[in-house]
């Protein structure tokens, strides 16, 4: 087998969202990088929904930007609708989401990658890893040649032994229209990696000209929403479009109930476990039988196509049943299908075989990121790609691994969860997974993480200076407003106390006290308002973090009867009894154990003087 005459610092296998981020970041750090993909025309392809962000996910993309990654920039360049979700709820759960033009997203990502010095993008299909039994040495390809590398980042997506299901029909594929990867699974088994099966799915695509939008609810975008941190208000590069909302009907329920045996999922033909929080329409009908109808979102796939994505109608039903189900939905009575819905099973690596750096415990120098680790979602994959790419370079340079903590980032929450829990279903990020989410808002990602990005060489000095300016400005202004007293009602109070009132916004404070309050613009003003309004809660969370850090290594005595601690949640009592953790820290990392449970446990240990 011929070996390519260049030895790379980092070889990245797969150019999905994890692979692109890994290759980009590794090359930006000065490494020589090979990005190996089976098809150059599907780089960063949005295989499922044409959107980036959302609850928890939008926070991750903002963190990627704060660290110097690329996903946020490509999203802003490709966005055709931007929104803030949960606007009526607290600041911790507000999150940006963008509809993107699928084709432009691919084009912009490919263009950005092509401009990075030291990054070689090559079409080829990885067939096996090269190793000496202990350390990875490179990769061999299906085409018959090999590449040598100090480290390898494997981001295989849904391609490892991918099996597509449409009703009773199934066939090999990494996604519809693309071949599966068969060799890598076999090779990972050879090396001793435990493989399992997971499942995901995608709905049909329809022709927009065949849809009756007049009976649907229009869902326009919001102003001044973006993913890249900026000093000025954001103006989208592309024309902006609306999404639309419709609903299933009684006919939809009847069609699914009568054909459930023909579903690949319910017919017993799918072995893998699907994502709990992204169920198929047949799953919804079965598990939520009491609901009369379900939301369906019609989302444009791009500006230069009439195809739309039918969010909420994912299914593995046969095509003839899909046809009837789609036409049972209000406004879709005459819908023309352009691509069928399908489910896909794929291999992932089971068990706790990765370090928090995302390096494999089994083969030195091999880093794993994305769906191969059991996650689902573009954003989760991209964040892992950034961490894997950075740490592959750190490995080559003999530097310590970069591992952000769960107290300072959603990326840290995910890394901790992936390396301390055994996943039995696809992992998706939600704000509820973070114990200190008020500290991890999407608006303060730059202030939390930009110093890491700058130190790693990913974030330019200019952008780092912008983040520092914003941080210093907010800290200084908080202090100044706290020392500025004015009459409000019958009392003389500091301006911070006035702003803490729920009905008072920073803009109102600026209008009422123009000589005392500075206009820092909408971006800094919004962050400043949140920092002041929620200062009490933020302070308590910071105190709790310090307390938890102090208690991390506190021993839990053997034989403790968790069922006797009535203040613990039922789930906590069951799981603590099952796993019998030795320390408070290990107890806190068990899936389903909340911060409140840990606090109850700590109080109980002190009270009973174990």
From Swiss-Prot:
Residues reported to bind NAD(+): 274-288
InterPro entries recorded: FAD/NAD-bd_sf, GIDA_C_N, MnmG, MnmG-rel, MnmG-rel_CS, MnmG_C, MnmG_C_subdom, MnmG_C_subdom_sf
Coiled coil: none
Cofactor requirement: FAD
Intrachain S-S bonds: none
GO function terms (MF aspect): flavin adenine dinucleotide binding
Compartments reported by the entry: Cytoplasm
Primary subcellular site in the record, as a coarse category: cytoplasm
Keyword annotations of the record: Cytoplasm, FAD, Flavoprotein, NAD, tRNA processing
GO annotation (BP), single: tRNA methylation
Keyword Metal-binding belongs to the record: no
One CC-aspect GO term: cytosol
Binding site for FAD: 14-19
UniProt cross-references to Pfam families, sorted A to Z: GIDA, GIDA_C_1st, SAM_GIDA_C
Subunit structure: Homodimer. Heterotetramer of two MnmE and two MnmG subunits.
Family the entry assigns: Belongs to the MnmG family.
Function: NAD-binding protein involved in the addition of a carboxymethylaminomethyl (cmnm) group at the wobble position (U34) of certain tRNAs, forming tRNA-cmnm(5)s(2)U34.
Protein name: tRNA uridine 5-carboxymethylaminomethyl modification enzyme MnmG
Organism: Chlamydia muridarum (strain MoPn / Nigg)
